[in-house]
Amino acid sequence: MDVYRIKKNAEFRAVYKRGKSFSNNLLVLYVYMNRKNVNRLGVSVSKKVGKSVVRNRIKRLIKESFRLNSDYMKVENGYDLVFIARKASNGKSYVEINNSVKNLIKKAGLYK
């Protein structure tokens, strides 16, 4: 499955405005149907979470978790997904972030 990145501020704002949100203690997920044949992934980590090293690590963990699980979880195509890290995600392991990502995708009902 192809996964592209959401990079532009306007694209993030569109997902926030029109999308539906799901949350747990570590992450928030916004989902918006983009009417394309691909999924697009955006990751946002606020400065409240920590310094740049911490924020970039969390971004990498979320992206890797989604990449490894997207085929396994059989996520449907045609969605914009934006993950927002909460302050509690600071210092969490890959396993905890991975479980959080899986949980949110299940909540959103994005299985084929």
Curated annotation (Swiss-Prot):
Presence of keyword tRNA processing: yes
Sorted UniProt keywords: Endonuclease, Hydrolase, Nuclease, RNA-binding, tRNA processing
Record-linked InterPro entries: Ribosomal_Su5_D2-typ_SF, Ribsml_uS5_D2-typ_fold_subgr, RNase_P
Quaternary structure annotation from Swiss-Prot or TrEMBL: Consists of a catalytic RNA component (M1 or rnpB) and a protein subunit.
Record function comment: RNaseP catalyzes the removal of the 5'-leader sequence from pre-tRNA to produce the mature 5'-terminus. It can also cleave other RNA substrates such as 4.5S RNA. The protein component plays an auxiliary but essential role in vivo by binding to the 5'-leader sequence and broadening the substrate specificity of the ribozyme.
Source lineage: Bacteria, Bacillati, Bacillota, Clostridia, Eubacteriales
Disulfide bond annotation, renumbered to this chain: none
One Gene Ontology term, aspect cellular component: ribonuclease P complex
The protein's name: Ribonuclease P protein component
E.C. number(s) listed in UniProt: 3.1.26.5
Encoding gene, per UniProt annotation: rnpA
Molecular function terms, GO-annotated: 3'-tRNA processing endoribonuclease activity; ribonuclease P activity; tRNA binding
Species the sequence originates in: Clostridium kluyveri (strain ATCC 8527 / DSM 555 / NBRC 12016 / NCIMB 10680 / K1)
Similarity comment text for this entry: Belongs to the RnpA family.
Top-rank EC class of the record's enzyme: hydrolase
Domain of life: Bacteria
UniProt record, GO biological process: tRNA 5'-leader removal
Reactions mediated catalytically: Endonucleolytic cleavage of RNA, removing 5'-extranucleotides from tRNA precursor
Signal peptide: none
